[in-house]
């Protein structure tokens, strides 16, 4: 049995410092980022103080699905939405934006079927809820060629982490298991022997795809994973840790550390290097991890910093919340939602 090694006291103090900093400004963030933070903190602590962020998330998912149902019956609005999404990537000159525009302009339905609809349905499913138009939405999912999507190398080069999420979400809601297909495509898209050909952005995209296989398999920090289910990922992280530390962003590095912790691999030399790196990345005066460009944007830094909080003072994964186990958290549901 693997025993958990207690984190260093300075790591705990730093984690708590970042956590307090973000909790003080939490409601200045978008609902999406509030819930991203609150849900992860709830799954680490089971503290009911995060109920407000979870209720806001439920309301937001309901509104987004209500709007999507309307758009699906109004072609002009749906086309306009897709055009706006594509335009936002077309304006970007960075490699990620260029790749996403070029890949997704050929598959525009990806925006509203996979990035939006599937995401919202899976989140509600997590909470033990469903939308009143659940049957209609499932029909839309069944009409989308997910097999082609998860076999597409160009889409993988643009959206690796998102595709990992989507493969596991479909499995979660009972609409097909494409997890093995996506993993095979990820391996074919990024063979290890060709790492030297990757740009820094594509190296990061590869790593994000790998970490999100682990994180999605855990139900997003709800339960542990088995190393034996993903041996190639853990072997890669161990063998390439020095390159990862040299070229990856803090978000990715922290997710790799959390991937080890989710598998109970607390004494990994690679994990010790990661913890040291993330701890040293924290600006103790600003109480957060800055971006790779030195930005201390509170909003843009939420993802990076909630990962640092968890990494430096890891508790354990906890399931939920859901309406069956935590009914008081889900009182006064939006009219369009019911228990599953």
Language-model regions: role of each:
Residues 2-70, 74, 78-83, 87, ...:
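Terminal, non-catalytic domain-edge segments
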